[in-house]
Amino acid sequence: MPDAEVRKILNIPEDRIVIELSQVTDSVEGTPVAYDIKYILYEQAYPSVESEIRFAVFPELTLPKMAAFSYYTDVQIRAVGASEAVAKVLECRIGEPLLLVERIYIQQNGKRIGYALHYSRQPYGALKGTSGYRL
């Protein structure tokens, strides 16, 4: 079951099942440089979720089941100090500056369907973006 912070962000009750996916990205030298934590609501209507988890990239796991314009993303980008848990995964010191990209996936009706955290170490974090759909 998700912790209180994740339940609050996703606006779900305590007994709601959430799937947590974690991924660490290493540099060529083998140093951990990025850490992703993703939460998606478990839907029994999609029995293939269990078999897809090993192979899917986060939005590809749930979002193809929806029309492209049926959801949007709230994004917050900020600098944070590494918590004890994140420092352990990224093999850095507690408090080391990291770039955090936090995303909440929201359906047009306001229902929150996913939450993602991406931590990047220096000098690997960079910002670049495109807005809207490019045809």
Regions found by a protein language model. Give the residues of each.
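C-terminal all-alpha effector/ligand-binding and dimerization domain
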Residues: 1-135
